[in-house]
Amino acid sequence: MRLNFAYPATGLQKSFEVDEEKKLRLFFEKRMSQEVAIDALGDEWKGYVVRIGGGNDKQGFPMKQGILTNGRVRLLLKKGQSCYRERKNGERKRKSVRGCIVDANMSALSLVIVKKGDGEIEGLTDSVLPRKLGPKRASKIRKLFNLTKHDDVTKYVITHDKTFPDGVTKTIAPKIQRLITPARIARKKYLLRQKRNQKIKMRDDAAAYHKLLAKYSKEEHDAKIARRRSSASHHSESEVKKTSKK
């Protein structure tokens, strides 16, 4: 079985091949996210504690958190769930995944070191891989360097040099996100002013509409009364003519 170790404190990763089942028994019947002491792997691992992050079986099917079995199941998966990436919007698909319990049929395990032991592991804990990429968000840069709102964040961006295939070396600086600039303030004021003007226009249009509607209703009411009066006068005239003939 291949054991893929990761040590977040140094940023390094390393794989080890372990063929002796006796050493691997300490992982059997353990679940994902469970912490395991790995003293049985050898003297160099004495005192180390790892967390099981996942793994694959011998056919390549991945482990899925929350499936309490050591075998394979077929689940209807959708966007946002692990072990599946949708190809179309709203697409769901039934896929085979392995449960979250480790057994002898696993071919690879992902392990994260949560507690360092007594000795150093070459290529994993003996050196530190420097981070080339720093934070991009303005608030996180301020938090990292303990800056105030009035300090210039652009002077504290973490940059790194990158050599391109043509041999040219350039300094790469990330674009700062959510940075408050005069242009952004002006744009926000413009949008607020536009929104306020739109509300005033809607209010004026609604008032004009209600005024026009009231005028139209009054005209309709007056016309209806006029028709009623005209009909009544015509009816009274016909009655007078009938009585005069008699």
Curated annotation (Swiss-Prot):
It comes from the Eukaryota. One of its GO terms (cellular component) is ribosome. The keyword Phosphoprotein applies. InterPro entries: Ribosomal_eS6 (IPR001377), Ribosomal_eS6-like (IPR014401). Its main location: cytoplasm. It is found in: Cytoplasm; Nucleus, Nucleolus. Residues 234-246 have a biased composition (Basic and acidic residues). Ribosomal protein S6 is the major substrate of protein kinases in eukaryote ribosomes. Keywords: Cytoplasm, Nucleus, Phosphoprotein, Ribonucleoprotein, Ribosomal protein. One of its GO terms (molecular function) is structural constituent of ribosome. One of its GO terms (biological process) is determination of adult lifespan. Residues 220-246 are annotated as: Disordered. Belongs to the eukaryotic ribosomal protein eS6 family. Component of the small ribosomal subunit. Part of the small subunit (SSU) processome, composed of more than 70 proteins and the RNA chaperone small nucleolar RNA (snoRNA) U3. Component of the 40S small ribosomal subunit. Plays an important role in controlling cell growth and proliferation through the selective translation of particular classes of mRNA. Part of the small subunit (SSU) processome, first precursor of the small eukaryotic ribosomal subunit. This is Small ribosomal subunit protein eS6.
